[in-house]
Regions:
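A shared catalytic/ligand-binding motif for oxyanion handling
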Residues: 1-188
Length: 188
């Protein structure tokens, strides 16, 4: 199973969309979670064109010129049991058709405005607590867990502590990411 999670910074950017299509097809991606789509809506043709396989899609519209989440799962691999959304997340409860294992994938896009940090973490904790299946939470949290996650020395330890406390309260474990260390590098 392969999950692609990417802050695409604008689904309308043709170069990024071409990269997305190529990656989904070359790597045979089963789950797609995009943040910062900067889109209100998607056409069926756009979504069908992303993969050679059928996907179930849902999206959270952008707020003006920022935000937006797109989540899709391959329908030949997964049956979708339920979908949910909040201000900062989209989720699908899915069952893997091959092994009959049910779990929930939650894609988040945390607020860049750290004044909304408490609302984001509270919403995420409430969502995880309501889950009846094991969960995978992925996305752009707009937060860091350690000083090594930051490229500059400007670190707000209070936010880092809040994030780590929330992760501990949800009993989540971090999965090492693959790819560029920072999403804004030239190897997007």
């Amino acid at each position: 199973m392969k999950l692609l999670c990417w802050n695409i910074r604008g689904f309308g950017n043709l170069g990024r969309r071409r990269q997305l299509i190529d990656y989904i097809r070359q790597e045979d991606i089963n789950i797609v979670g995009l943040q910062e789509t900067v889109r209100q809506d998607f056409s069926i043709q756009e979504l069908q064109g992303l993969s050679r396989h059928p996907f179930a899609w849902q999206w959270l519209p952008a707020s003006g010129q920022s935000g937006g989440i797109l989540l899709g799962v391959r329908e030949d691999f997964f049956s979708v049991e339920d979908m949910d959304r909040g201000e900062f997340f989209l989720s699908m409860a899915i069952t893997d058709r091959r092994v009959n294992l049910s779990w929930e994938v939650i894609i988040v896009y945390g607020p860049a405005d750290h004044g909304r940090l408490a609302a984001f973490l509270t919403e995420l904790q409430d969502k995880v607590e309501r889950c009846t299946f094991p969960v995978v939470v992925a996305g752009d949290f707009n937060l860091i867990r350690t000083e090594a996650d930051k490229s500059s020395p400007n670190i707000v330890r209070r936010r880092m502590r809040m994030f780590n406390d929330a992760i501990a309260a949800m009993a989540l474990r971090e999965i090492a990411r693959v790819g560029a260390r920072f999403t804004w590098t030239n190897k997007q």
